[in-house]
Structures are given as structure tokens and as C-alpha cells.
Curated annotation (Swiss-Prot):
This is NAD-dependent malic enzyme. HAMAP family: NAD_malic_enz. Gene3D superfamilies: Malic enzyme, N-terminal domain (3.40.50.10380), NAD(P)-binding Rossmann-like Domain (3.40.50.720). Belongs to the malic enzymes family. Homotetramer. The gene is maeA. It comes from Shewanella amazonensis (strain ATCC BAA-1098 / SB2B). The active site is at residues 101, 172.
Amino acid sequence: MDDNKRPLYLPFAGPAILEAPLINKGSAFTEEERIFFNLEGLLPYAIETIEEQASRAYDQFRSFNNDLDKHIYLRNIQDTNETLFYRLVQNNIAEMMPIIYTPTVGLACERFSKNYRRNRGLFISYPNKDRIDDILNNSTRHKVKIIVVTDGERILGLGDQGIGGMGIPIGKLSLYTSCGGISPAYTLPITLDVGTDNPHLLEDPMYMGWRHPRIGGEEYSEFIEAFMEAVHRRWPDVLIQFEDFAQKNAMPILERYKDRYCCFNDDIQGTAAVTVGSLLAACQAAGTKLSDQRITFLGAGSAGCGIAEAIVAQMVSEGISDDQARSQVFMVDRWGLLLDNMPNLLPFQQKLAQKIDNINHWDDFSDNVSLLNVVNNAKPTVLIGVSGAPGLFTEEIIRAMHSHCARPIVFPLSNPTSRVEATPKDILHWTSGQALVATGSPFEPVVVDDVTYDIAQCNNSYIFPGIGLGVLACGANRVSNEMLMASSRALAECSPLAKDGSGPLLPPLEEIHDVSKHIAFAVAKVAIEQGHALDTTDELLMQSIEANFWYPEYRRYKRTSF
């Protein structure tokens, strides 16, 4: 029997039920439930359906004049009635996703302490490092299956937001549920409060975090280790998603734990998976392969290099050598093109640095090879921005790229919209509508020469909810690179452009449930093949995916004794 059709037996009554967001129905409690649970008189007389409630909530939502107020309003509903919150978001997913996550969540993080209203998730502060087990036991969520955790140091493109970074785990888990069907009862947002180096926060009398410079070195590593061990004592099978850790910590943490626990880093691996999936769709629509492309990155941090490594892996899977694949990928950061003779390259950058012997014949060659120089000499067919610096894809650069590539693929992926390398409107006008554009944050359609171009949002929300659903459905104990590659290929299979050569690069958000299920199946199949999950039939796997998919519907309640 479907869980939503089974009655749920509750041992408490009265106002306590109305204060429990996972249980509260508000005006939808039936007459029988109001009597049995001592709710008569605590609610208006009318008994409403969830759709009637959602209609009222939507009218209230539309009454707010700015996106931050809309975000706060939706969070208030989430903190009082989660089922209604997810029905409202499900009914209006394209309109509300930019409100509950990027770009609005960035402003919510910046103003987190100022706008704080009600607790959600767990804050684990460094001064409490010896009581992590007790803190985890304080959570009201006892069946946690997915955790999103941040230390708040690199929030989107906004930098160190301290505990204000909690807005990111809350928002990401909201998307796990609204896009991937993960029950909110199985999710837990966590912020690791290890101090902040943001002087504005340290001086802000309203800041609610630990007022101390960020810890680092061994202290930091030992704290992360204590957290990971405590989490797996409490919930041994949990999936952990690392979110918005600084570059200096993100890759080392991932490398340390990816083979010990079921975990992944969304900034590195999720961004890579959705970008590769989008590139595969674009290549399929053009009748080419990813291994045919020449790809330039602006931004050579952990996210950019993570995408580049995923692209190299996909190119190799298409039949070219690793060396050949790497020779077709050009990484540019603030110091110019990464070259193998540069000192102080980070370990994850070294394998992606171009051999200086391969490029010293370029026109205008110098020790600092600019992005424009790379475009003029390497003649890339794909340009990807993950720099977090706005406006760096200039008209000169885009026109230079278009001069040697009839249909350039341009992905300015930096978040939020204020940090984007170039707007879709500018890119399409500079290329007379010929560029294929995808962005990290949502943008309105662009009209060029009376033709309307929908802008694909190359957002991780197309990927990580399906990964989570697949892990839960098959009981995987790891998230491998091959599972992530499978998610990319599954996303490309959902592309309207790849299917028939027309339409948007990525499917509309209204189809996100089907996309997540398709990705979940592909991810789970690879997990089983690799021995990360128990073997099962395709039919039973699909049944498990459906059984794990939660829909925002009210359940019947029955009273049981204390």
C-alpha cells in the first residue's frame, strides 16, 4: 500500500501538532481529526483541500513586491507546513525555483542573521566539537537519509557568509524534495560553524554565529573528521553532499572521504555532471561528439577543474587518449592560461595545465596568456565560465570565438546572476543568435531578429536530486565517478534539442520529476554493476524508485495512546 494511503498514528494532540511542520495540515484537518486531536476551535471552521490552501498561498506569494520577501514567505510556510510548501512549489516550479534557490538564496544568506525567524537543521559549532554526537541526537529528524552540509566559506560567488551559509543546505534539500521526490522527513541541513573571516559579520551585532576567525590546518581537519565519524555513527547509510566549501578545502575533503563514505561534492561533481550532460546534448544535436570539441574554461578552481576532469573522462570514453583529451582543454584563471612550467599550481590543476611546448608558437605568446589570446589561438568551440567574476566574456572575446566557430557553445555558469561572465542577451546579440547558451542562474528568453531563444539553466538541480533518488532506491554505499558519468548521459537523453534538433537544450522544469527518475535509474544501474549496491532486476529497481518518490499529499491521522 502507498504510504500516503496508510493512516499515520500520532501519540500527541492539540497545539503540538500544529507546531510540527512535517505533520501539520492547517485548515485541511478533517472534522474527525479535529475532534480526536483536540483541534476544535484552534482552526477556522472551514475544512479545505490542499489545492485550496495552495491557491490561497499562491495569491499571498504574488502579493509580495520583491524576491527576498517571497523567499521569506515561502520559508515561513516550509517551517509551518512542509506538505503545503512542496505542493505550492510543485505547482509553480519554474516560477518558484529561483526564489527558493539561486539567485535569491544568495541574498537570503547575506541577510540570514538579520532575517532569522525559526530554527531549521543543525548548527555544529567548533566550541562544541566534543559534543557532536549529542548535537546530532538533538535532531528531530530520526530517519535521515540525505544531509547537505556547508561551512559557509564560499557561498555561491559571495564568499564567506559564516552561518548565513545555512540558506544553501536548506535550499538544496528543498530541491531534493521538489525535484527528486525525497521525503522531507529524510533530509537534514547542517552548517559547520568554524568561525568567519568576514569582517562585516564579525562586527555585526546581529550576527548569530561563533565570533572568531576561521580555524584551519589540523584543527579544521580534525573537526571535519569528528563530524564525519559522528554522522555515520548516527546514520550509517546516509548520503552526504558537501556544499560551498572553499577551494582549499573542497577537493581535499572529497578525496579523503569519497572512498570511505557515501558522499559527493556538488560544486565539483554535480556541476561537472550537469555541464557534461548539457554539452553531450549540444553535441548530439549537432551530430558531433564531445571528443571533437576544443574547450576553454575561465576559472580554474575546484569547480572548473572538476568539470574539466569529467569532460576528459567522457572524451576518453569516446575513444581518444587521455593526453589527446587534455590537449583540447584550456584552463584560464586570473594569471592567464595554466601552463606546466608555472610554480604553485594546486594538485588538481597540474594535470590540466597545457604543455608550454605545445603553445609557445602562438601569436602574442607571453608568460601570461590571456583569455582572448587563448580564443584567438586555440580556437575553442566551447567556452565555459566558472570564475565568479562578472563581465569577463567581453564582446571582443565572443566575436573572436564566433569568427572561427559558426555555432559557439557558451556557458557562463557563475552564480548568482550578478556574477555571470556575460548575459545571454549580449552573447546572442554578439553572435547574431548563433550561440548555444546555458547559464547557472535563470534568465528570461532573449529575442534576436524576431526569434525568441529560451535560455537553458545549466543548474545542478537537474542532476543531484536524481543522484540522491538513485542512491536511496538501490541502497548504494558510494557515489562513484562512473555513477556521475551515468547521470550526465541520462540527462543528455532527456534533452529536447538532442532528441529532435529543436527546442531547448534542457527539458523544462515542469518535467523534472521524469528527468530525476530517469537519472536515478541510470545511477542505480551503475552502482549495482560496480558492486556498490545489491543486485536486482530492472523491474524491481523501477519499483523501488517509485516507492521512494514522495509526493506532497496529506495522510490520514489516527490517535494512539501516549
